[in-house]
Amino acid sequence: MNKEKVLIIKPGYSETLDGEIGMITSLGDVLRSTVLLHLYKNAHVTWLVDEKAFPLLKGNPFIQKILPYDLTSVLQLQSERFDTVINLEKVAGLCAFSDSIHAWRRYGFRFDPENGVALAYDGSQHVLEICMDNEYKKKSGKYWEEVLFEMVGAKWRGEGCILGYKPKSGVNYDIGFNYDVGKKWPNKAWPMEYWKELERIIGNKYTVTWQSGLGNIEEYIEWINSCRVFITNDSLGLHIASTLNKKVIALFGPTIDSEIYLPDGVKLLPKTHYDCKPCIVSSCIQERSCMYNIEPEDVYDAIENISKKEI
């Protein structure tokens, strides 16, 4: 019996549950999308991805073919036939490309030929509403994975991401400082002076390692795996650490913490009365970012609590 042929289109140019579209590849969004592979473990899966995110998918046992998003791959896929196409990108050109693929079933986003914009296939309209209406998004109260499963007509039961690369490093440090947030959302960063103050408070009680391996995803994964407890902004490292079953302390400000499923972690939010938080935008309108209202002492207390059984 032939396996179901599934094409997943997720280069990472638009975050699935965010209205913003750009050409900065969202590596975290690509990794989080792998939760769908739990539904297609017995299928033949092809994944179209930006080359920057390729290392996140490489070696994944549930992806039979990984293709870089380029003209050659587009022409190849337009000549193939699939049972199911899942388009998780809202880029208009990718939606038009997705519609051109020969397939029996389609999920996610499609192209509106009248207006030249992305629309949703039946069953995904509420996802488009979440993307385009920040107030609706704040009130949704659903985990990102839950919404993704709903897009394909399935029920999420706590499944997590599936990382292809298997780290070889052991645990060498008590605590990892994951301070970088990348270029897309600079205001998600906890102030550097707070990281340094936290290190001072910790002193010699725990061994601390600062973020490394940023230029190579596999090295980055190895570094994360070397940490027992992981302190992080809302970034790629958060999702990798959760996938590796690390004890995570996640610092949230401008983004929605309730979207993030963190079974082995703690979420810390700013102690502030700003009406704008979470603003869900990449630049802050305040004189002082809300991230300044997560105190190093509070993070240290979280370390103590989460470390009682771990260190």
Regions found by a protein language model. Give the residues of each.
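Catalytic machinery of carbohydrate-active enzymes
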Residues: 1-311
